[in-house]
Amino acid sequence: MKLLSLTGVAGVLATCVAATPLVKRLPSGSDPAFSQPKSVLDAGLTCQGASPSSVSKPILLVPGTGTTGPQSFDSNWIPLSTQLGYTPCWISPPPFMLNDTQVNTEYMVNAITALYAGSGNNKLPVLTWSQGGLVAQWGLTFFPSIRSKVDRLMAFAPDYKGTVLAGPLDALAVSAPSVWQQTTGSALTTALRNAGGLTQIVPTTNLYSATDEIVQPQVSNSPLDSSYLFNGKNVQAQAVCGPLFVIDHAGSLTSQFSYVVGRSALRSTTGQARSADYGITDCNPLPANDLTPEQKVAAAALLAPAAAAIVAGPKQNCEPDLMPYARPFAVGKRTCSGIVTP
């Protein structure tokens, strides 16, 4: 996909995203009730070599669409975060993050609560890829209890505003539930925007690429980009590395450049990556240097299992209904049950 052809994509989103957030006050009060039993949510959380109920320095990894936690991170941030001194933990909402994003979020919220308690009430970082970033921001927006438990958010290729490239799948009625929700202008992304979720809630770094073949628009290095959050540290790879630098959706997670930015974010005293920690000399699109040869091979093929899962996974012909707590923020949008009302 050529960069020039993507430039016009930004115009599509311009009518969907205002220059400033529409609502600045986040939802407050008690968390919404989970739709899933706690035992089911607990079963979706795993820590490397530790129990979530007793874990030292955890980092929560939230995977992308079409994958489990290990499929997203075995070849990259599970070993890399271990090298940085963390105990990696991850969620794997079934099936392969293809279900309702709101349900996927419940797995993350439950995991944060468990890991916070299991580490002695210590805040923890959350690191995400693709839909995982949307899940994290949805959770921080609508589940107030976790805001004080999350130390920082490092999001690789998040689609906070969805992607215009999901539209053709929706039109053919061959989209998974979460793909419907990740379409630009969906009820879910509208609710996130209107609830104040396009502004960082915890210290946040977003790393993304103009040449992403899955999430667009990402070309403007501005609030029009799907991965951009107000007040966040927004790092478009091409803004640092130049317009000819190419990393795809997977490379936004696995590349050496992504590792340097992510490492800075995790080490920073502010919770955001520091511009002084990365530059043109770090602009290597290949998998991170500190990975083994086997991990580098797996990282380079990261999208293959995701694509296979999406093709074989559940399909439906409409966007899942919003949970009651989110409906007031997307009045007038259409979901499976019809037009959203408060």
UniProtKB/Swiss-Prot annotation:
InterPro entries: AB_hydrolase_fold, Stereospecific_Lipase. Glycans are attached at N99. It catalyses: a triacylglycerol + H2O = a diacylglycerol + a fatty acid + H(+). The keyword rRNA-binding does not apply. Residues 1-18 form the signal peptide. It comes from the Eukaryota. Disulfide bonds join C47-C89, C241-C283, C318-C336. The keyword Disulfide bond applies. Residues 19-25 form a propeptide. The active site is at S130, D212, H249. GO terms for biological process: lipid catabolic process. Keywords: Cleavage on pair of basic residues, Disulfide bond, Glycoprotein, Hydrolase, Lipid degradation, Lipid metabolism, Signal, Zymogen. Hydrolysis of triglycerides. Is very stereospecific both in hydrolysis and in organic synthesis and has a potentially important application in glucolipid synthesis. This is Lipase B. It comes from Pseudozyma antarctica.
